[in-house]
Amino acid sequence: LMKSEPYEFSIDDLASRKNQTTYWEGIRNYQARNFMRDKMNIGDKIFFYHSRAKPLAIVGTMEVASEPYPDPSQFDPTSKYFDEKATEEKPRWFLVDVKLIKKFERPVTRDQIKEEESLQEMMLIKKGARLSIQPVAPHEWEKIHEMAGEPLPD
């Protein structure tokens, strides 16, 4: 699961990109970075979650479209994601490209997830679990699709 604030970058923004693909920049939390750098592989499926929105919701699915690579914004002094300690030789921050699979016609809200008995262990609803990138268990992936009325992507 990857979170984005829709006023910064929404699922509609992703849909409007060339090939419905973009890079997922700006991760500046080590645990989230490690998920992206060490656990994500090309073809892995991802939920797109709108955070700081009304309602908070899983709004669709994407897939990883590249191997992890250094986030170029860390080297750009004009970027809000600039990191003066990062160097080309020793980058600190990584990203992957993501490609839209499907925008849900019926997003699944955080409140709906909290009410679903089988999703009580989902990191998204755990107190203090604010990471912008989070793992999702296979049964959670399947249940969210069921709740959205969507078939599982290939």
Go through the PLM ranges and name each one.
Residues 132-154:
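Charged phosphate-binding loop/patch that engages nucleotide di/tri-phosphates or the phosphate backbone
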Residues 49-56:
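Short, charged beta-turn/beta-strand-edge "cap" motif at the junction between a beta-strand
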Residues 60-131:
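Aromatic- and Lys/Arg-enriched surface recognition patch
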Residues 1-11, 57-60, 77, 81:
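A cross-family signal for N-terminal binding/gating loops and helix N-caps
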Residues 1-42, 140, 151-154:
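Compositionally biased, charged N-terminal/linker segments
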Residues 20-23, 42-44, 58-60, 92-96:
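A generic structural signal for short beta-strands and their flanking turns/coil linkers
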Residues 47-48, 63:
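Hydrophobic beta-strand signal
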